[in-house]
Amino acid sequence: MSVSQKHPFHLVDPSPWPLLGSLGALASTIGGVMYMHSFTGGGTLLCLGLGMILYTMFVWWRDVIRESTYEGHHTFVVQLGLRYGIILFIVSEVMFFLAFFWAFFHSSLAPTVEIGAIWPPKGISVLDPWGIPFLNTLILLSSGAAVTWAHHAILAGLKQQAVYALIATVFLALVFTGFQGIEYIEAPFTISDGIYGSTFFLATGFHGFHVIIGTIFLIICGIRQYLGHFTPKHHFGFEAAAFYWHFVDVVWLFLFVSIYWWGGN
């Protein structure tokens, strides 16, 4: 097996995964619409499409890890391109959350008469920001410190220490997700309670979804670190996970300050 390539550029091999992923996305979209309108077979098609997407994600990323770790395809130029890619991806995620913050501030800065011309809307009992939300803020910031600890350990060649740091990060992420679930269960309002409920659950819910994705990302990095895939000079997979996790931290700080603290007063 070749362990290097004669050029520094990112040229991918022929792969069936883009086609399979596209078919999975098509099936899940059509199946989702059919399921929402109670058509026969909609749920089955939706599950099939989601299964295809999950399988594609697994095998495609498996191939990327093989190309990077065992075949030497990720040269400096390729890694630079991947860094630009993850940065642009995070910028697109910023735009995604910007829509939710825009909806929240549009509604809260100039509340309409339909909601009592006040914010929070009349009849809404808000959550105490200094309870679970503040605790979750401390937990998520601690997880950000732990992932930074893991990064420095990898740079220093301390394999075991990096594994421990990633375990701590994943543990804190799971605790955060658990507390978020408890908060949702005990919330005195629902997503159907007007603009406050919809913006609250959409913004915090999508953030929670990103936390789950980031947790899976970090678990994979922990396994790879345990297997010795990362070196002080070659660990972009971990760097991408760390970039993503710090983005999740920053979004939560904005959510806490704007929706929980300012928006709840």
From Swiss-Prot:
One of its GO terms (molecular function) is cytochrome-c oxidase activity. It comes from the Eukaryota. This is Cytochrome c oxidase subunit 3. It catalyses: 4 Fe(II)-[cytochrome c] + O2 + 8 H(+)(in) = 4 Fe(III)-[cytochrome c] + 2 H2O + 4 H(+)(out). Component of the cytochrome c oxidase, the last enzyme in the mitochondrial electron transport chain which drives oxidative phosphorylation. The respiratory chain contains 3 multisubunit complexes succinate dehydrogenase (complex II, CII), ubiquinol-cytochrome c oxidoreductase (cytochrome b-c1 complex, complex III, CIII) and cytochrome c oxidase (complex IV, CIV), that cooperate to transfer electrons derived from NADH and succinate to molecular oxygen, creating an electrochemical gradient over the inner membrane that drives transmembrane transport and the ATP synthase. Keywords: Membrane, Mitochondrion, Mitochondrion inner membrane, Translocase, Transmembrane, Transmembrane helix. InterPro entries: Cyt_c/ubiquinol_Oxase_su3, Cyt_c_oxase_su3_dom, Cyt_c_oxidase-like_su3, Cyt_c_oxidase_su3-like_sf, Cyt_c_oxidase_su3_a-hlx. The chain crosses the membrane at residues 16-36, 41-61, 85-105, 138-158, 162-182, 200-220, 242-262. Gene3D superfamilies: 1.10.287.70, Cytochrome c oxidase, subunit III, four-helix bundle (1.20.120.80). Component of the cytochrome c oxidase (complex IV, CIV), a multisubunit enzyme composed of a catalytic core of 3 subunits and several supernumerary subunits. The complex exists as a monomer or a dimer and forms supercomplexes (SCs) in the inner mitochondrial membrane with ubiquinol-cytochrome c oxidoreductase (cytochrome b-c1 complex, complex III, CIII). It is found in: Mitochondrion inner membrane. It is a multi-pass membrane protein. Its main location: mitochondrion. Belongs to the cytochrome c oxidase subunit 3 family. Its EC number is 7.1.1.9. GO terms for cellular component: mitochondrial inner membrane. The lineage of its organism: Eukaryota, Viridiplantae, Streptophyta, Embryophyta, Marchantiophyta. Pfam families: COX3. One of its GO terms (biological process) is aerobic electron transport chain.
